[in-house]
C-alpha cells in the first residue's frame, strides 16, 4: 500500500496527522520559508508524544541549497541532535553552485546520520540534471527523494516522476507539492509508492487587536493574522483513497 507522509509545522499538526491516518510525518518550522529545522522544544515534544515515524527537516535557512561552511556545520550538529533524540530518519539536501548534488557534503551527512533513513528533499527539483542526481543519491545511500518532477507542482511533473521511478527501486521516489485528495488517484495509478502532502489550511488568528500597518515579516504582503494547520479531514480522505486503491 502506498505510504502517506504529511508535512507538519507544529506538535498540534503532528497529532492531527497521526489521528487521521498519516503513515509518516515530515516535521518542519517556518512554512512561509518552505520548511526549516524545528526547534529543540518541538523536537522533544514530538518525539515524546507521536508514535508514527517522524523525519525532521535539516535546513538552516530559506532560499537556495548552497550553504556556507558555518551553515553546513550547523546542519551536521542538528543531524547529530536528531539522531541522539531517536528519530528514525531526517530530510535534507545540499547542492553545488552548478546545480549538482554536493556529494562531498552528502557523504558527511550520511556519516552523521548513521542508521537514520535520509530523504533528499526538493533541492532535487533545483538540480540541473535530475537523472544524474538520482544516480548520485543512490550511490550515497539515500533512502528516498521528494520531488515534484522539477515542476511547480507534482501534477505537472508526473511524467518526469514516472521516468524517475523507472530508473530503479532505490531511492524511493516520493511525489510531493500540490498532492491532494482531488489528484491523488493519478499518482497511485502511475505507480507512485509514497506521497507527500501538506493537507493544510490557513487558520485565522484569534487576535482581536490588529496593527494592520505593521508586519513582522520581510514580506510586507505576508498575512500576520493566519497560521498553517493540518486539516484532519483532508488527511483522512487521502488515506481512504489509498486504502481503496490497494483493495482493487
Curated annotation (Swiss-Prot):
Superkingdom is Bacteria
**Main location per the UniProt record:** cytoplasm
Q: Might you report a single GO cellular component term? A: cytoplasm
Molecular function per GO? copper ion binding
Q: How does it assemble?
A: Homodimer.
The record's similarity note reads: Belongs to the CutC family.
Name used for this protein in its record: PF03932 family protein CutC
Gene for this chain:
cutC
